[in-house]
Swiss-Prot record:
InterPro entries registered for this protein in UniProt: RNA_pol_sigma_r3/r4-like, UPF0122, UPF0122_fam_protein, WH-like_DNA-bd_sf
Source organism (scientific name): Exiguobacterium sp. (strain ATCC BAA-1283 / AT1b)
Similarity section: Belongs to the UPF0122 family.
Coiled coil spans: none
Annotated protein name in UniProt: UPF0122 protein EAT1b_2891
Role played: Might take part in the signal recognition particle (SRP) pathway. This is inferred from the conservation of its genetic proximity to ftsY/ffh. May be a regulatory protein.
Signal peptide limits: none
NCBIfam families listed in its UniProt record: PRK00118.1-4, PRK00118.1-6, YlxM
Amino acid sequence: MTLEKTNRMNYLIDFYQALLTPKQRNYMSLYYLDDYSLGEIAEEFEVSRQAVYDNIKRTETMLEQYEEKLALFEKFEQRQQLLQTLKRQVELTDDVSATISALENLE
């Protein structure tokens, strides 16, 4: 599993956890947030490893479907990019203001 997928799933869990059942929330939290193995989760809940795997895969699919329809994560990423752009613009503005002040003080 790639770090990118793990990060994406962590965000999707954060955004859509209210739409999951308690069991789905538990499995996903343990697997993605707490880095439990399938075997450890299976042991904790006294179910088969395959049952945990199937539940996690179904839940991943559900989370992706929620994201397709609601786009909360996509909008979050867009807001973050716009915020970074705004911060850069403000920094540039501050730099320009400081330079103008320095020039004014030279006269």
